[in-house]
């Protein structure tokens, strides 16, 4: 049996007045997704427990079959795993965004989609000016970077589970004054964030960006900290070998911790300009070597964060044409198979950030008896009697291990 999971990140949304009361999924031309729905079933799942933030880290952990209430320790440790950065028992990983803050308002949580090369230069400057034997700055992908705090038994890190931080993508166009880190260790985090302003102010990268009419990276924003999680390997838990295709370190890290093969796709950017067709091709190739392939696409989520309705629809249509369609055709030649399409969480355009709530799931393949669904969208899922309020249990159902 071959399995494919396709994750159009954050694609679940609300009805839009501009679309005559339809959601982006309803408005988009997605014949391949609709064919999966018609050939199989559409249902609902919830991957965002009410008392945890609706982050992709928590939601994707649940989506991949792991209870976040049991295994989740923070976002940054997952991204550290993606970069191959080892974490000892006293170490903490901290997500480090490069952001643009003007007049204490979060103008851009991506520093204007700063490039990885530019980010690497700024992170090197931060390491030189702010780093130490205990505090290390690590460049990642674009605006997504890391700080690692190296602790030891005699001098443990000052942080704890009570340290509170705010994701910068929750603050777009809002004041940041009430959202700085608080709790144990927050003084250190806030000092690093403040000190980075002086490091970046006259940096050549920012001067060049401003001269080109681009937003500068005014400072770092620290959040999502945690220690290394202890996740059972997917092969031990489910008996299958997997592979992950994504441009986002969070998903790469989850895949690494699960023991999955990492497949890097040329042209995969984690943004709206990603090479959708290449992701589809590489997924089909990977099916020859592993049992399960997971394809994650960030573009739909990024469009919502930016509040771009048309961009979200265009991303959905590109995913359908270049990823879902070719993969579904290839799978049918590899019978037996199963395919599942679902986002991790809703990212409503109205909010420009993640939200708790149900997501629509389309599933088809061997031994899946079709229901009456004809389309893949939120209203169709809402009418389904099948519901997984504990979304991490959905994986057992998808793999045919539960009814």
Where are the regions that the model predicts?
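Feature captures the catalytic ectodomains and active-site-proximal regions of enzymes
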Residues: 1-403
């Amino acid at each position: 049996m071959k399995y494919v999971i396709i994750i159009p990140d954050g694609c679940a949304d609300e009805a839009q007045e501009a679309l005559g009361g339809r959601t982006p999924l309803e408005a988009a031309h997605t014949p391949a997704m609709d064919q999966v729905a018609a050939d199989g079933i559409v249902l609902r799942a919830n991957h965002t427990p009410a008392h945890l933030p609706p982050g992709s880290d928590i939601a994707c952990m649940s989506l991949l079959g792991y209870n976040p209430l049991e295994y989740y320790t923070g976002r940054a440790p997952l991204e550290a795993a993606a970069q191959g950065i080892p974490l000892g028992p006293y170490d903490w990983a901290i997500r480090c965004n490069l952001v643009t803050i003007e007049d204490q308002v979060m103008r851009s949580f991506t520093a204007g989609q700063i490039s990885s090369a530019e980010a690497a230069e700024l992170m090197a400057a931060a390491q030189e000016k702010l780093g130490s034997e205990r505090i290390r700055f690590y460049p990642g992908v674009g605006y997504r970077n890391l700080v690692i705090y190296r602790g030891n038994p005699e001098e443990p890190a000052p942080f704890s589970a009570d340290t509170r931080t705010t994701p910068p993508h929750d603050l777009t166009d809002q004041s940041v004054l009430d959202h700085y880190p608080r709790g144990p260790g927050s003084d250190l985090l806030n000092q690093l964030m403040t000190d980075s302003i002086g490091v970046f102010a006259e940096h050549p990268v920012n001067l060049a960006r401003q001269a080109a009419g681009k937003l500068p990276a005014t400072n770092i924003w620290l959040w999502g900290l945690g220690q290394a999680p202890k996740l059972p390997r997917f092969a031990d838990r489910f008996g299958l070998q997997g592979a992950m295709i994504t441009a986002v370190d969070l998903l790469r890290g989850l895949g690494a911790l699960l023991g999955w093969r990492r497949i890097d796709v040329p042209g995969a950017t984690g943004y709206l300009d990603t090479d959708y067709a290449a992701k589809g091709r590489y997924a089909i190739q990977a099916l020859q070597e592993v049992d399960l392939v997971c394809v994650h696409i960030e573009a739909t989520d990024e469009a919502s964060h930016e509040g771009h309705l048309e961009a979200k629809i265009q991303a959905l249509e590109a995913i359908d044409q270049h990823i879902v369609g070719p993969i579904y055709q290839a799978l049918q030649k590899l019978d037996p198979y199963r395919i599942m399409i679902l986002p991790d969480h809703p990212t409503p355009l109205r909010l420009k950030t993640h939200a708790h709530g149900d997501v629509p799931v389309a599933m088809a393949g061997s031994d899946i008896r079709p229901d009456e669904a004809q389309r893949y969208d939120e209203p169709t899922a809402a009418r389904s009697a099948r519901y997984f309020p504990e979304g991490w249990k959905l994986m057992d159902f998808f793999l045919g291990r539960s009814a």
